[in-house]
Every structure is written in C-alpha cells, then in structure tokens.
Amino acid sequence: MNAIVALCHFCELHGPRTLFCTEVLHAPLPQGDGNEDSPGQGEQAEEEEGGIQMNSRMRAHSPAEGASVESSSPGPKKSDMCEGCRSLAAGHPGYISHDKETSIKYVSHQHPSHPQLFSIVRQACVRSLSCEVCPGREGPIFFGDEQHGFVFSHTFFIKDSLARGFQRWYSIITIMMDRIYLINSWPFLLGKVRGIIDELQGKALKVFEAEQFGCPQRAQRMNTAFTPFLHQRNGNAARSLTSLTSDDNLWACLHTSFAWLLKACGSRLTEKLLEGAPTEDTLVQMEKLADLEEESESWDNSEAEEEEKAPVLPESTEGRELTQGPAESSSLSGCGSWQPRKLPVFKSLRHMRQVLGAPSFRMLAWHVLMGNQVIWKSRDVDLVQSAFEVLRTMLPVGCVRIIPYSSQYEEAYRCNFLGLSPHVQIPPHVLSSEFAVIVEVHAAARSTLHPVGCEDDQSLSKYEFVVTSGSPVAADRVGPTILNKIEAALTNQNLSVDVVDQCLVCLKEEWMNKVKVLFKFTKVDSRPKEDTQKLLSILGASEEDNVKLLKFWMTGLSKTYKSHLMSTVRSPTASESRN
C-alpha cells in the first residue's frame, strides 16, 4: 500500500511535531544506506514475522558525521527540538523491514527523507493536532485534498504526571493519495490503530500511577503559593514517549506495528480485473479452435490406424498422398488457418476507400455487410489476402467464410469472400446476380497511373480496380445505418486509424446486441410479425437494409449462445402447470 503512517505529538514548547513515521519503498535503497556497517558493529538480527524481516542497524557516528546528516535532513534543526519532540537518538539510521514476498522495504525515521513527503507529513501533522480534530479531541477523523493527500487521523492522550492537565496530546495519521482506498480501509485502520493506542496508553498509565504513588503532584501543586506572574513549572516539561511508557524498545515495536499495518492493509484490498461476458466473436473463435483440435485429433488417430494396417509405401507415393489439392487447401484456409502477409497492401478501410474511391468502396462495403459474395480477381495473391483481411473487420467473426485464392469458382454457400485468379470463368448467373460483387484488378496503363493517397506505399499505383455488380447501389440509397456511421468515421480525418478500429468494434457490438434481441424475439419466443415490426422500430432497424443486415448477422451467432437460449425456453406443459 502506497501510504505513510506517522506518530505525531503536540509539544507545549514547539507545537505539532512528527515523532516517528514509516514509509514504503518499492525501489532499491540508495547506495550506502546500511551498507557501510563494519563487521564489529554488526547488524542485529532479526525477527521474521508474516514474511517481513526486520533489521535494526545501529551505527556509531562521530559528531561531525551527525552534524552533516542533520544539515541535509529536511526536518527541524536540533536547536528547535526538545526531548519530547525527538524519537530516535542522533545518528540513528532508523529501521528497515524487508518483505520477501513482494520485495518491498518498510523504512522508519523520525521524518521522511524526501522534501516533498516531509512537507505533506508536516502539514498533515499540524492539521491533525490543531484544526482537524474529532469532537472531544480524541478519536478518528478523515480530511485531505488531491494536492496534499488524504489523511486518516486518530488523536489520543497519554498520561504524564508533569504535564499540564496530567496528559499529553498525540495522533497517529495514515496518509494516502487514493481517497477511495483510504475510505474503504477505515474500519480496518480504526481497529488496528485503536489497538496500538490502547497499548501505549496502558503502558503510560502504569508509569503515571507509579509516579503519582511515589510523589503525588496534585498535593504538591495545591500547597504551592499562588502568584499572578508566569513562571516555569518544576520538573521536566518535555518528556520523551519512551520515558512516559518506560519502554526502551518502543520505537522498534512501533516500526513493527506500522510496517505490519501497511502490509496488511495493502493485502486486504486488492484490485481485480473483472471482464464482462465473452463477446460473440470470442465464443465463435473458441468454437472454431475446438473444432480444429477435434479434427486434428481424429486425423492423428486415423493416421495411426492406417500406419498399423497398411504396408510401407515408397517415399514418392507417400509424398503425393499427403499433398493437398487446391480446393482442399482453399477450404482449410477458409477455416482460419491461412496466414495473412506481414506487410499488407491494403493497410486499413480508410486506405482502401482512398484507393477504390468513395462510390466503389460504398458499393463493396454494402455487399459485405449484407452478406453477399465478394469476389476478387487478381494475379497478386497478397493483394487479395490483404483486401479480405481489411474487409472482414466490418463483420462478426461468425459471418466470415473466406477462400483466399482458388483456381475455380466456389458457390456462395461455401464462402462470402472468394479470391480467384484472372483466368477463372465466373458463371453468368453470378455476373448478373444482385447478391454478388466482383472486384477485378488490372494492370494500369501509364497514362492512368495516379497516386493512391499514401506517399509511403506506391505498390497500388500500378493497379486499376473495377468494381461491378448485378445490382449497383444507388447513390441516393440510404443503406444500413452501420454503413453510414462507418463512412462518417472514415471521412473524419481527426480520427486516427486506431480510433476508427475501436469505433468499428463498438458499432459491431451494438448491432450484435440487436441481433441477439431479434433472435430471442423471433426464433425462441416465436412472436408474431406485428410484434417483430414494433421491435425493429424500437431498435432503430425497421428499414429494409437494416432488416437484411440483422438476418445475415444472425447466422454469426455462436452455437453456445443459441443452445443456451433454447435450453432456457419453458415447455408448454411446465408453463400450464405454473398457471
């Protein structure tokens, strides 16, 4: 937990002071901190508790060395400190605890070594013992801001027979920059800090009662002659907390308590990345992967059986049998096993729109979204594959069936993206069909060479693209809503390519949710046609193109989702018995 725990004291001579603080260090300690100990002075060892190893390093400093440390410290000068304002002796390096589980160090000093942290702790100390006080001046309170951090403060009194009112004022503060985390930790911190305070007050009460029994200060003060002039009281008005509790190991114990408090509070609340339900694309990809693994297992089993039964064949025959034909390789590629080229010719939808032109791209995108067959004829296989890789981003994964490159025409039920070599003949009914679009790639004449809008990629300037269809999309046709939004995003030059990709993901998720509602409404609940029309108008998809798009995208729903909906349908007998 990134926090600082500090013990503060209100000195009658110097005001609010920080006595002791423990901070968390995630980075290695600076060179020289605790590494200059001589073997004779040694390191006192060390107690392991809860995965934390505590080192108490005591070094003997010369006066000159102590003075140099004091001058570089951001804390108050020695002349401004009394016995009650000081915790560790001059030259004491502090306490360090190593957490072996997380490689975190918990370091305790009288003041933080960093000037900015010292300022934050100093301000929190002053506020906790002056203006930010719980009613009754003893108890917990929360205050702070974004600039100086947020503070959980618990003020309390310690008995002192020589102090005004026989008690001194202290506070334990916890400082964090995360307000929500600190508020959620309030019950935990309150209980543990209250335990530390009770222990300190119990020790001080025993010392106070012993001193009162030996020399009652109340009787002595009552017998003192009254004078209207101010004078210094008898005894030491500035007593250290170690003398008030009669505990020489007080600071080591406080370091252990504060280090455990920081570790336990940080381990108590942890952040977890909560992902939502898997999208339809994720479910479809998982189903395809499972099918491929199942096929490979069955293929391996059948090969093993054939090897046991069949005789050994010559090498040439074996190689010929394992070679797949063009149709087989194309169909396997449609299952997602083909690898797109590393440097695509078409880089994005925006790039393709610049190359083809706005009217041709709109026609092509309309056919893609409607589920019609998209045929590319080109000698460049990489060009065709890059085009399909870009166009498939407009569809859900379950609606994509690709044959990247084939030497013969494949029917539309087998694929909606088909790559063909230029010499392949397309059937006449496909050429005149309104459910297909053909993109022919020809070598451009020198007179028709033109820039494609990308200075760093001139590979497409040698091509000419002709987009034809049996049912060209009219320029004044509204088209599906998602197509208009995609074009608006592509034409907005203020949006980068990455932002457009994320916008496309959001649009697909939006329309897949509409598809799920329509599927549940029509296929599962079997609602009448009138109710379906009302639902489509509510979804904002009552236009003809939107309805066709929803019906096509419905084929991309995962089997998992469909089976889940079907299994939750109540049988007529069960519903009648409930009624």
From Swiss-Prot:
One of its GO terms (cellular component) is cilium. Residues 326-336 have a biased composition (Polar residues). Changing R392G: In a primary colorectal cancer; somatic mutation. One of its GO terms (biological process) is positive regulation of intrinsic apoptotic signaling pathway. GO terms for molecular function: enzyme binding; enzyme inhibitor activity; GTPase activator activity; protein-containing complex binding. Belongs to the folliculin family. Multi-functional protein, involved in both the cellular response to amino acid availability and in the regulation of glycolysis. GTPase-activating protein that plays a key role in the cellular response to amino acid availability through regulation of the non-canonical mTORC1 signaling cascade controlling the MiT/TFE factors TFEB and TFE3. Activates mTORC1 by acting as a GTPase-activating protein: specifically stimulates GTP hydrolysis by RagC/RRAGC or RagD/RRAGD, promoting the conversion to the GDP-bound state of RagC/RRAGC or RagD/RRAGD, and thereby activating the kinase activity of mTORC1. This is Folliculin. The gene is FLCN.
